[in-house]
Structures are given as C-alpha cells and as structure tokens.
Regions:
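Generic hydrophobic alpha-helical membrane-segment signal
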Residues: 5-9, 29, 98, 160, ...
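Small/flexible residues
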Residues: 4-6, 95, 207
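Short, surface-exposed interaction patches in beta-rich subdomains
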Residues: 154-237
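Bacterial Sec-dependent N-terminal signal peptides
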Residues: 1-29
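Acidic (Asp/Glu) and glycine-rich low-complexity loops/linkers
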Residues: 18-131, 137-152, 156-170, 184, ...
Length: 237
C-alpha cells in the first residue's frame, strides 16, 4: 500500500504535465505586406486570399513562444526555434493560418502540409519545394503557375482551378496531380519517379527523363516531345 501511495503523486504530476503539453493557444498577429512566403520549419499551413495580411498561430503555448514570423523584403519567413519539437512530433505540430492580399510565391524549405482555404488569385503564382517530404493542395486562378522541386524532395502537389500557362519541373520522388486545374498551354518536365497529371486544352511541350509518367487530359491539338530519354511514358486520355 505504501508503494501505491508513493507513486500516486508522481502519476498526478505526469498527468498534469501531459495536460499542460496538450494545451492549445491561439495568437493573431497583423503583418506588413508581403508577396512571398518562406516556410523554414515543420508546420501545417492554411492560406487565405483576402484584403489584409495576418498570421494566426495555434498550438502548444511553450512552442508558440519559439515561433517567429518576420516580414523582410516582401517575404514572410516563418521559423520554429523550439528545441524539443522532434521529441513528441504529434503534440508539437503548429497550425498557421495566413491571410495575404497578393501572394506570388511559396517556398517550402521544410516538411510541411500546405492547403488553401479559398482560391489564390494573381498574375503569376508559384511554389518551390526543397525539403524531403511535402504535401500541398492549392486552389488557384492566375495567368501563370509554376512548380519545381529539388532532390531529395518527395511528396504530392495537388492543383485545382484555372490558369493560362502551367509550368512544372518535377524531380526525385514528387507527384503532381493537376487534373482539376484547367490550363491553356503547358510545359511539363518529369524527371521524377512520380507521375504528373495535367489538363491542357491548346498545346503541351513535355519531357520525360525519369520513370514517372505524364498523364495528359484535355485533348490538346499540339503535343511536342522536347527530348525525352526516360523510362516513363506520355499517356493521353
């Protein structure tokens, strides 16, 4: 019995600590104008096209204290400097909701999940991924959209909406699903092990340099191979 009572305070302390770890705080921070978002740490990112610029941070209070959101040279850089973020990754995720009135580029430099909550609009919008694993789902309506990634970046990019020109350069283990994005013209270069799926109505210039395929929808009258030498194939639907 003494042993049981001896452990009880310890259990209560651990329970209190766990409850504290799971506490969620929300911070709302106005921002100066920016057109580029650079993600330098692991986050769940939700993007909103709006008429102002702000960031809302949601997560464990002790981790939020170590999150920095800084605007410099029209770029919003977001960092998480918390030392213990890899100890309990499920409890240490930070949710960012970012409103912008003119986003033109997203740089994902760390493993992140990026989603739009409404449609991003503009003349040109792009996303660049340079970390090992990324997931992004974007609704867009713009004149031109581009995507490229670096080794060893893998993951999946899903695109929906409309654009006049679509430009994709995919390498490593990346997959791009743009079937729900209607484009007039496209440049598609696939050197990845993953596939590219696109929906293009006028013409496509493509190159396959890896094992991944290009699935083409939209029945464009002009489809030009610019020098494919990979094992993947063009599959027209």
């Amino acid at each position: 019995m003494k042993t049981r009572f001896l452990f009880l305070p310890v259990l209560l302390f651990l329970f209190a600590q766990c409850a504290k770890e799971k506490k969620v705080e929300v911070l709302h921070v106005p921002l100066a104008e920016f057109d580029t978002l650079t993600i330098n740490s692991v986050f769940d990112v939700y993007l909103i096209q709006g008429d102002s610029n702000y960031i809302t941070l949601e997560g464990n209070p002790k981790i939020l204290e170590k999150v920095r959101a800084e605007v410099s040279d029209n770029t919003l850089n977001v960092y998480n400097d918390y030392d213990g973020k890899w100890l309990h990754p499920g409890n240490n995720r930070i949710k960012l909701t970012i409103m912008t009135n003119g986003l033109t580029r997203i740089n994902s430099g760390e493993t992140s999940n990026i989603q739009t909550l409404n449609t991003l609009t503009g003349n040109e919008i792009g996303i660049v991924m340079t970390s090992k694993l990324n997931q992004a789902t974007l609704d867009i309506n713009c004149n031109s959209f581009y995507f490229w990634n670096n080794f060893p970046c893998g993951g999946k990019l899903t695109l929906r909406g409309n654009t006049h020109e679509l430009k994709i350069w995919s390498v490593a283990l990346m997959a791009v699903d743009a079937q729900a994005l209607v484009a007039d013209i496209a440049t598609l270069e696939n050197k990845s092990k993953g596939d590219i799926t696109a929906n293009v109505t006028q013409y496509v210039h493509y190159l396959i340099g890896g094992t991944g395929n290009i699935h083409l929808w939209g029945n464009p009258p002009e489809v030009i191979d610019t020098g494919s030498d990979g094992d993947g194939t063009l599959i027209q639907h």
